[in-house]
Amino acid sequence: MASESSTHKTKLEKKTCLSFLSSFTRSQIVYPTQGISHYYPSCHMMVHAMNITLCDNFDFKRANPNYHPYILRLYCGVLFWIQCLRAGNDVNDLTDVQHRFLNRFLDNHPLETLAVPGPLLGLFKTLCSSQPEFPHNHNGKVYPRIPAQPGPARRDAFMRDLLESHFLPNVPGIFALLEDLTAFLPNTSRLSKERQAHSRYPKYPDQSLNEAFADCYSNFNFQVTSAADNLEKISSFLHMKHSMAWFNQVKGVADDVAASFEGSGTLADCSPHGLVANQVMVVLSTPEHLPESPNCIADKRATYEFGYQLKSTVRNLPPLAEALAAFSQTYIRMFPNHPFFGTFGSKTLDHGPFWKIRPIGSSLTDNSSYLTIPSIVKQAFKGPAT
């Protein structure tokens, strides 16, 4: 135990020291807050395995005549854009046009009414802003950025000549598929094979599903499109400039799909800020056989294996964040010798200060986990709701 004299001496020394330094106590270090950092998100792991499972189930198709793979792609594509807008809103990086549209959409379609099927819930949770851990939380947030001008000035241009556009849901393109599908099917005087031959896009569902859906197509009340439609604004790109009513019918299909899968939720379960999975880059490995130019939708010649490495500068990543990043692959770097998109995800240093942190850690290459996705989706499928 310290003596009374030593305690008194310590207090005296401290008081003397403070008296000498009193004029300098106002000099305090202020750590600058770095700007926000962004990445361009990818939807290439979305929906396909679910659609294959649903198309293979006779009971589901019979119970849900409004279902078609294109409708589910349309719904999930719209939600992908909306969730990215929510993340952008969290970091105050939306344009006035985007902000007004987001508020209008959520007024018409509250988060609790937007079903998210179980296999996709984790994917949508990764589309958020997140706070880096280092240094001292002074780095700005990391978030998925979408183009302020999502579409071209004319619909018949199909999409913007922008690399990022190829990895975002092409909602006008899905509408083109729907219109193309229904343009031939109502004409019962043609043989199914002849209709398929005249269609621009071979359909991966069976022909009976296409024909049954044609009878339900008018239920959706989709707006009439024109080649001259300007798709530069988000409301026009998502086909909601004049009315959002058609989306209610699409939501009904999504409700039926979500009810058929374990672990489903709503967009209200997907916070616009939270998971640090978006601080992990999924670097795709060069496949043994490079993809070829596709001639139609879902052309297998354009597909490739999804071997990958995980890379990040974060030192204390939760295991769940790494698993979610690998499963959802919403933030990717394409392998450099892809014949069309080899530079996607490679130029990150100009996307904000977070990407300049070093060193970068890496995982081992995983060449097999992606093969389990179809079985994971099938295991989550409960069958049509009764």
UniProtKB/Swiss-Prot annotation:
Highest taxon of source: Eukaryota
Encoding gene (name): ILR2
GO CC entries: cytosol
Effect of inactivating the gene: Recessive resistance to auxin conjugates indole-3-acetic acid-leucine (IAA-Leu) and IAA-Phe, but normal sensitivity to free IAA. Defective in lateral root formation and primary root elongation. Resistant to manganese- and cobalt-mediated inhibition of root elongation probably due to an enhanced ATP-dependent manganese transport.
Transmembrane segments: none
Keywords attached to this entry: Cytoplasm
Taxonomic classification: Eukaryota, Viridiplantae, Streptophyta, Embryophyta, Tracheophyta
GO annotation (BP), single: response to metal ion
Disulfide bonds: none
UniProt subcellular location: Cytoplasm
Function description: Regulates an ATP-dependent metal transporter (e.g. manganese transporter). Probably involved in the metabolism of auxin conjugates such as indole-3-acetic acid-leucine (IAA-Leu) and IAA-Phe. Required for root development.
Organism the protein comes from: Arabidopsis thaliana (Mouse-ear cress)
Signal peptide positions on this chain: none
Protein name, per record: IAA-leucine resistant 2
